[in-house]
């Protein structure tokens, strides 16, 4: 699955409804967030398991009718480097153990 790293998204991961349904993720609760345009959004939150840095992690998954997004909660403890140019590299690297949550 491809996803976009969204530095303005403070959640863990967002997935579109069809993908959540096909994965059979269990519903957990409703959530509320303020979007970049200032509007409020109410959405469903599910529970998912991801393999991140070779470890399984149980995380909340927000339902959003968009491209899958990786949020800053999942990126906590990692360094993000972006080459801002055509075909630039995006690198995600774990910080030293003492600097991880």
Language-model regions, residue ranges each:
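Pepsin/retropepsin-fold aspartyl endopeptidases
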Residues: 1-101
């Amino acid at each position: 699955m491809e996803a976009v790293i969204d530095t303005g998204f403070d959640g863990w991961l967002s997935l579109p409804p069809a993908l959540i349904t096909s994965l059979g993720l269990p519903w957990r609760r409703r959530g509320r967030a303020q979007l970049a345009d200032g509007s409020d959004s109410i959405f469903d939150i599910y529970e998912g398991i991801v393999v991140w840095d070779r470890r399984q992690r149980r995380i909340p998954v927000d339902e959003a009718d968009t491209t899958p997004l990786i949020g800053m909660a999942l990126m906590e403890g990692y360094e993000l480097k972006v080459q801002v140019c055509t075909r630039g590299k995006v690198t995600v690297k774990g910080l030293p153990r003492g600097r991880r949550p």
